């Protein structure tokens, strides 16, 4: 299973990358806006840190606009993956970019059928948003499980990125279901590394070590 970090904060990306667990990065316009920096500058710096897929999202809503933005974005670095919205125009753009050999990540997926349409259009990745589904009392991880089953049934190679991850349980369930990727906020990555019994064990070892004759 791959871990992407879901942020545009370069400091967070550097710190998580130093742990040796980050395989890629996902960004979106909201995350870029929080950085207060130019979009292209942020993406360039991220590609210098992480040698893996970097999802960068278009903001155009029409096919031609999406393609124009995508073709500019991929000039930044070969690892750029174009994030496209799950709309009919987004599907058209996915098909076009697939034909050009450009990788795509169809985002804002909230149903198995949306994921299937994206896979059929040639998406490299689909991103179901589990946290947002949970927020409206739907079963976010259940949707991921259904997508996994459908893709396996028909041999789709489109990878599933579990997005809108809110807690370590989302990551655990993603791994158990067989999702290809979980894209995780920095704070949740840090939570994954912690356990109170680990802290207690370290404390006990150090206390015992102090008793050893020096």
From Swiss-Prot:
Predominant location: cytoplasm
Lineage, highest ranks first: Bacteria, Pseudomonadati, Thermodesulfobacteriota, Desulfuromonadia, Geobacterales
UniProt KW keywords: Cytoplasm, Pentose shunt, Schiff base, Transferase
GO cellular-component term (any): cytoplasm
Catalytic activity, EC: 2.2.1.2
GO BP, sorted A to Z: carbohydrate metabolic process; pentose-phosphate shunt
Official protein name in the record: Probable transaldolase
Record: active site: 83 (schiff-base intermediate with substrate)
Species this protein is from: Geotalea uraniireducens (strain Rf4) (Geobacter uraniireducens)
Recorded metabolic or biological pathway in which this protein acts: Carbohydrate degradation; pentose phosphate pathway; D-glyceraldehyde 3-phosphate and beta-D-fructose 6-phosphate from D-ribose 5-phosphate and D-xylulose 5-phosphate (non-oxidative stage): step 2/3
Classification via InterPro entries: Aldolase_TIM (IPR013785), TAL/FSA (IPR001585), Transaldolase_3B (IPR022999), Transaldolase_3B/F6P_aldolase (IPR004731), Transaldolase_AS (IPR018225), TSA/FSA_arc/bac (IPR033919)
Family assignment from sequence similarity: Belongs to the transaldolase family. Type 3B subfamily.
Function as written in the Swiss-Prot or TrEMBL entry: Transaldolase is important for the balance of metabolites in the pentose-phosphate pathway.
GO molecular function: aldehyde-lyase activity; transaldolase activity
Pfam family, one: TAL_FSA
């Amino acid at each position: 299973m791959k871990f992407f970090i879901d942020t545009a904060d370069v400091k967070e990306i550097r710190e998580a990358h130093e742990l040796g667990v980050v395989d890629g990065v996902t960004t979106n316009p909201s995350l870029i806006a929080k950085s207060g920096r130019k979009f292209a500058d942020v993406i360039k710096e991220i590609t210098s840190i992480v040698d893996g897929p970097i999802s960068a999202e278009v903001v155009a809503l029409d096919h031609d606009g999406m393609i124009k933005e995508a073709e500019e974005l991929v000039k930044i670095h070969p690892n750029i993956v174009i994030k496209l919205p799950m709309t009919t125009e987004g599907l058209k753009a996915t098909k076009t970019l697939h034909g050009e050999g450009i990788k795509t990540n169809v985002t804002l997926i909230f149903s198995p059928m949306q994921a299937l349409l994206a896979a059929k259009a040639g998406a490299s990745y689909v991103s179901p948003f589990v946290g947002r589904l949970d927020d409206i009392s739907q079963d976010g991880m259940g949707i991921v499980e259904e997508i996994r089953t459908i893709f396996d049934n028909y041999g789709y190679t489109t990878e599933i990125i579990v997005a809108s991850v809110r807690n370590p349980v989302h990551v655990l369930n993603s791994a158990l279901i067989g999702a290809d990727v979980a894209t995780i906020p920095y704070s949740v990555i840090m939570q994954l590394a912690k356990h109170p019994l680990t802290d207690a064990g370290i404390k006990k070892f150090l206390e015992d070590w102090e008793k050893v004759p020096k």
